[in-house]
Amino acid sequence: MKLFDYAPLSLAWREFLQSEFKKPYFLEIEKRYLEALKSPKTIFPKSSHLFYALNLTPPCAVKIILLGQDPYHSIYLENSQELPVAMGLSFGVNPNAPIPPSLRNIFKELHANLGVPIPCCGDLSAWAKRGMLLLNAILSVEKKQAASHQYIGWENFSDRILARLFETTSPLIVVLLGKVAQKKIALIPKNKHIIITAPHPSPLARGFLGSGVFTSIQKAYREIYRKDFDFSL
């Protein structure tokens, strides 16, 4: 079985990225991920949600990109069952999962900037459906092992996704939180897209709260689309 048998990817994205799937780097990603999936190790998010960010936001609908690093590797308990916090969206979590500190800070800054009520649920699917691509640079992780799937090569693929999107004629709003995400600035054509940077929202970093990042996103969105982005959840 092939990768897309385990991890469905929408036709729109398969057509958009079709030139990538036979390249040696992608075949190596497929091989390594499937080996990990078939091993005794538990891999997050569930394979059905590996490409969830792409499936919720077709390439023609992308207006904002919020780039994350890699999925949450933690679990939570629901009816005595261990479930992954990760759901395939950068910073977002499964609807019943506790809200992680980074996402809690995102909600605090959003409220401080735009007055959006702080949600009680960390599912960001609504943003994705409105045109915010919530893409992680690394798409999978081993349970309780942070950054454990760097070796798979996902960043080669996510870089190609970004590069293909940056080739589009419409201006995109690219939000890069933290130094790791900001390394992607080199991929972005100058004077074509709007780049917004801020510190990482983790409590271990400093400067995210008070950065005004959502004010900047909304200002850019208004300039392009003459309306506000709906941040409600």
Swiss-Prot record:
It holds the Pfam family UDG. The keyword DNA damage applies. It is an enzyme of class 3 (hydrolase). It is found in: Cytoplasm. Its main location: cytoplasm. GO terms for biological process: base-excision repair, AP site formation via deaminated base removal. Excises uracil residues from the DNA which can arise as a result of misincorporation of dUMP residues by DNA polymerase or due to deamination of cytosine. This is Uracil-DNA glycosylase. The gene is ung.
